[in-house]
Amino acid sequence: MAKPRRNNKNKKGQSRSQAREKEEAELLKLQERIDQYDPAVDEKSISQFSDLPITQETLRGLNESSFMSLTDIQKKTIPIALKGEDLMGTARTGSGKTLAFLIPVVESLIRNKITEHDGLAALIVSPTRELAVQTFEVLTKIGKYNTFSAGLVTGGKDVQYEKERVSRMNILVGTPGRISQHLNEAVGMETSNLQVLVLDEADRCLDMGFKKQIDNIVGHLPPTRQTLLFSATVSDSVKDLARLSLTNPKRIGVSSDQDVSATPESLDQYYIRIPLDEKLDVLWSFIKSHLKSKILVFFSSSKQVQYAYETFRTLQPGISLLKLYGRHKQTSRLETTVKFTQAQYACLFATDIVARGLDFPAIDWVVQVDCPEDAVTYVHRVGRAARFGRQGKSLLMLLPSEEEGMLKRLENNKIEPKFMNIKQKSKKSIRPQLQSLCFKDPMIKNLGQRAFISYYKSVYIQKDKDVFKVEELPSEKYAASLGLPGAPKIKIKGGSSSKEKKNASRQLVALSKTNEDGESVENEASKVRTKYDRMFERKNQNVLSEHYLKLNGSQTKEDEDEEEEDDFMSVKRKDHELTEVELPDLTIPVSKRQAKKALSKKLSISTKGNPTKLKFDDEGVAHAIYELEDEEDFIKRGDAKEQKKAFVSRETEVMNEADEEDKIMAKEKRQEKKRKRKEVEKRMRDEELQSGDDEETVYTLGGDVDLERDMEYSTDEEEQPQNKKPKWFENDKHNRKNPVNHIVEIDEPETLEDLESLTARLLQH
């Protein structure tokens, strides 16, 4: 019977080796197709995902997710990314950039035979939590037949839970802040085997203030990686990031530096000219006239979103209302995203957090209540509609002061929205209802005041002052349109921006509020001072001031001693007579030229010549500080342009060497920090194990009973089992109620003491 079993094992081993050889042969064929690909010749012949040199597992996931045909950006980027080259892709919003980098990521891991033991192999950075969630969902759909482990890390989740599992991930999708935190703090998270880095919506990441986090992420990664950078627009900051992160990148989708991605062709764009105090009336009328539509409304601040949502929900326009902004909890943000995605007719009030990358299906209208900060933001906002060739419409509300400047900036980017007239009959005013709500509900009134202040601040901080003119805004009319009795007072504080405060490390903020001993110290300015505090702090109500007492010399000796110790400057004598000091005779210049020369600093310096200060070089040789070279000596050294190029090249080499040294030093510091953290954790684990060994306790997890092993750890003095709780029929109270059933057994008493003890026992029972 043993021989057939061996034959079966041999057959299984042969089948496994054959399957492995077949898989390697398929990968070699795919690699040959990738190497032979020529964009100029083969791009026209590719129209379906099945035409690409990708594995059957990835193709099966694409087909089941209904991804069949390729878009323009996918045709151009996927074959080049499969070759392993760095890529900088730019295309219109809604053109399929997500699949353009997810397919190369999955295929790169398959060709490199990455397993769960190889650690992190691909890193995808998204600017917002919603976009990261959407990217992760698409990744799980197309990669469901592969054996990679993928994880999603975003803000608003348990950091410790993520740290325990992030080291076992092959593909990691997340926001810049959380990924940077894990790279700095997570133990066991190695990036030496990383193959691909993807920066999705790179310009948005930089606009949101994540430059430091992205630089930190890039610094942790190996230089031999492949980097894919995708964005809907290209700015100077994105070009700088590409220059630092990419190596000889292929630029796809951008024909020139001045080219900016236009809006989709299937999008109908309109704008209206409207006063500030009529915006909410027009928005209400628009929603009432489009109840059978899916509408996305953009505001400039989260406070405006809250106010519009609460008031419109109370007035009940007849359509489902939703809100989405940055300071929501992560769970509620995901619920809102899912509800709006699945709804057929709904209206979502949102900030620019929704303007990038999110794919909401079948949006009919995009309404911009507040003017976007630039043409790039306009492109991303209206790009939520008319995605993947669908029809869509957009409406932009412009103030009379914003119309001319904003239209010029849109025309410069080849965007020409059509003007739309508003019929006065179709416009309905909701100002009386808003005033009634603010009068009845203090919460809505507070929201209105905060919305007013946040809108003015958003206009004030805009850089383009030709478009945004805060001095021309009618504050009283706008406050009345919100239902407020008057315009609130606005205090605009200077200092660091809100983005920097939001992205600042909470540990550093907490550390800044501690003293030298590490104890937290409350800020004196933030304390609330009551009228009693001010009453006890009053001074000089019935006595003369300290300064007057000092001048009159009516201080005591103790006060004078304290003054000498504590005061830095004090009055030492009073009403003293000044002694006349003989002043030197100043000769007045006779001529006007000498007088002018004496009064003019420039003329007086010209006669003194150059300064005679000496400067010593590294070898200790003294040189004059203004030691200049003659023109003849300069010409002998060669052409000025050639000297300039040589100087720039020398300094560039010096800076590159210094940069490499700084990177090596920073990397050593990070490794040393991580090593110390690992030592501390190892020491803590050893202490726990030692404490467990001292107690000499053995835990058996499964398996058969081992009596010899158990007897080795047994002791003579076993712990007595804990007394069980007496049952109801064993209770003393029950025994007292039934004294007949209780029998007391005793020996025959012989002495007087025995009789006394017997009497006591009988009395107890």
UniProtKB/Swiss-Prot annotation:
<feature type="region of interest" description="Disordered">
    <location>
        <begin position="1"/>
        <end position="24"/>
    </location>
</feature>
<comment type="function">
    <text>ATP-dependent RNA helicase required for ribosome biogenesis. Involved in the release of U14 snoRNA in pre-ribosomal complexes. Required for pre-rRNA cleavage at site A2.</text>
</comment>
<feature type="region of interest" description="Disordered">
    <location>
        <begin position="552"/>
        <end position="576"/>
    </location>
</feature>
<keyword id="KW-0547">Nucleotide-binding</keyword>
<dbReference type="InterPro" id="IPR001650">
    <property type="entry name" value="Helicase_C-like"/>
</dbReference>
<dbReference type="GO" id="GO:0005524">
    <property type="term" value="F:ATP binding"/>
</dbReference>
<feature type="region of interest" description="Disordered">
    <location>
        <begin position="641"/>
        <end position="735"/>
    </location>
</feature>
<feature type="binding site">
    <location>
        <begin position="91"/>
        <end position="98"/>
    </location>
    <ligand>
        <name>ATP</name>
    </ligand>
</feature>
<dbReference type="GO" id="GO:0005730">
    <property type="term" value="C:nucleolus"/>
</dbReference>
<protein>
    <recommendedName>
        <fullName>ATP-dependent RNA helicase DBP4</fullName>
        <ecNumber>3.6.4.13</ecNumber>
    </recommendedName>
</protein>
<keyword id="KW-0694">RNA-binding</keyword>
<keyword id="KW-0698">rRNA processing</keyword>
<feature type="domain" description="Helicase ATP-binding">
    <location>
        <begin position="78"/>
        <end position="252"/>
    </location>
</feature>
<dbReference type="InterPro" id="IPR027417">
    <property type="entry name" value="P-loop_NTPase"/>
</dbReference>
<dbReference type="Pfam" id="PF00271">
    <property type="entry name" value="Helicase_C"/>
</dbReference>
<feature type="compositionally biased region" description="Basic and acidic residues">
    <location>
        <begin position="641"/>
        <end position="653"/>
    </location>
</feature>
<dbReference type="GO" id="GO:0003724">
    <property type="term" value="F:RNA helicase activity"/>
</dbReference>
<comment type="similarity">
    <text>Belongs to the DEAD box helicase family. DDX10/DBP4 subfamily.</text>
</comment>
<dbReference type="GO" id="GO:0016887">
    <property type="term" value="F:ATP hydrolysis activity"/>
</dbReference>
<feature type="compositionally biased region" description="Acidic residues">
    <location>
        <begin position="558"/>
        <end position="568"/>
    </location>
</feature>
<keyword id="KW-0690">Ribosome biogenesis</keyword>
<dbReference type="InterPro" id="IPR011545">
    <property type="entry name" value="DEAD/DEAH_box_helicase_dom"/>
</dbReference>
<dbReference type="InterPro" id="IPR000629">
    <property type="entry name" value="RNA-helicase_DEAD-box_CS"/>
</dbReference>
<keyword id="KW-0378">Hydrolase</keyword>
<feature type="domain" description="Helicase C-terminal">
    <location>
        <begin position="266"/>
        <end position="438"/>
    </location>
</feature>
<keyword id="KW-0067">ATP-binding</keyword>
<dbReference type="Pfam" id="PF00270">
    <property type="entry name" value="DEAD"/>
</dbReference>
<feature type="compositionally biased region" description="Basic and acidic residues">
    <location>
        <begin position="678"/>
        <end position="688"/>
    </location>
</feature>
<dbReference type="InterPro" id="IPR025313">
    <property type="entry name" value="SPB4-like_CTE"/>
</dbReference>
<dbReference type="InterPro" id="IPR014014">
    <property type="entry name" value="RNA_helicase_DEAD_Q_motif"/>
</dbReference>
<dbReference type="GO" id="GO:0042802">
    <property type="term" value="F:identical protein binding"/>
</dbReference>
<dbReference type="GO" id="GO:0003723">
    <property type="term" value="F:RNA binding"/>
</dbReference>
<dbReference type="Pfam" id="PF13959">
    <property type="entry name" value="CTE_SPB4"/>
</dbReference>
<comment type="subunit">
    <text>Interacts with the U3 and U14 snoRNAs. Associates with pre-ribosomal complexes.</text>
</comment>
<dbReference type="InterPro" id="IPR014001">
    <property type="entry name" value="Helicase_ATP-bd"/>
</dbReference>
<dbReference type="GO" id="GO:0006364">
    <property type="term" value="P:rRNA processing"/>
</dbReference>
<feature type="region of interest" description="Disordered">
    <location>
        <begin position="493"/>
        <end position="526"/>
    </location>
</feature>
<feature type="compositionally biased region" description="Basic residues">
    <location>
        <begin position="1"/>
        <end position="14"/>
    </location>
</feature>
<feature type="short sequence motif" description="DEAD box">
    <location>
        <begin position="200"/>
        <end position="203"/>
    </location>
</feature>
<feature type="short sequence motif" description="Q motif">
    <location>
        <begin position="47"/>
        <end position="75"/>
    </location>
</feature>
<dbReference type="GO" id="GO:0032040">
    <property type="term" value="C:small-subunit processome"/>
</dbReference>
<keyword id="KW-0347">Helicase</keyword>
